């Protein structure tokens, strides 16, 4: 009896190397980086890269600084506001406000100083966030450019079947890389930085009223001494 061999289709496994194409990577990453540099100031680009180190930090909390302000207030009650001039304050906003209070600035001006510094800090954060938002916008466009270049190369080499596959790979993978860079890297980074910046601005505004209150202590202390 004749045995008829039934051929089974070969199962092709997904090989990770098939999804790597140096030319497509260069077009997407290089084009995105160039677009970001051309659209933003170099200082903002540097801040955007430096902001990557803050992604996994906890959101800023003003509780520790409020405790320091309370301690400084007790010192000012006991020894006078001018004794705070020797205090070592690590936080720049708090240090600037205490220095202004020691110099005799009014409470309203101290509060305005804190709010202005919070606004300036938020503006710097916004510039860094816009760098990553711009990268998320540029990456898919660079992927489309890579796709067009790959298709042009493919149609130009129709007479050479050996090069058609490589050109088609560039065309398809460039689109894939652009989508991945935008949706798995740039946009998540921008969203995370935006949440951190919003939380920090809200927390730092809590410092304005206590720091402004420090500016009133010297007058109150003088009245107590006179009485």
Language-model segment annotations:
Residues 2-128, 204-227:
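Large intracellular
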Residues 2-9, 121-194:
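Helix-termination/interfacial motifs at the ends of transmembrane alpha-helices
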Residues 172-227:
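Transmembrane alpha-helix interface motif
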Residues 40-44, 158, 191, 195, ...:
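Transmembrane helix-loop junctions in multipass membrane proteins, especially transporters and channels
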């Amino acid at each position: 009896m004749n045995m008829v061999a039934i051929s089974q289709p070969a199962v092709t496994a997904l090989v990770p190397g098939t999804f790597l194409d140096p030319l497509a990577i260069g077009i997407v990453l290089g084009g995105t980086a160039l677009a970001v540099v051309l659209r933003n100031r170099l200082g903002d680009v540097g801040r955007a890269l430096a902001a990557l180190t803050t992604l996994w930090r906890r959101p800023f909390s003003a509780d520790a600084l409020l405790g320091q302000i309370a301690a400084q207030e007790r010192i000012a009650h006991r020894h006078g506001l001018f004794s705070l001039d020797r205090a070592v304050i690590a936080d720049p906003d708090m240090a600037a406000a205490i220095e202004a209070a020691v110099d005799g600035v009014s409470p309203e001006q101290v509060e305005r100083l804190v709010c202005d510094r919070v606004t300036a800090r938020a503006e710097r954060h916004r510039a860094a966030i816009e760098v990553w938002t711009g990268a998320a916008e540029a990456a898919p466009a660079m992927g489309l450019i890579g796709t067009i270049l790959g298709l042009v190369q493919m149609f130009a080499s129709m007479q050479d079947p050996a090069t058609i596959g490589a050109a088609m790979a560039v065309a398809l993978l460039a689109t894939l890389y652009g989508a991945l860079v935008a949706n798995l890297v740039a946009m998540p980074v921008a969203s995370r930085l935006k949440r951190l910046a919003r939380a920090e601005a809200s927390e730092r505004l809590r410092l304005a009223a206590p720091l402004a209150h420090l500016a009133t202590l010297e007058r109150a202390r003088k009245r107590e001494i006179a009485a």
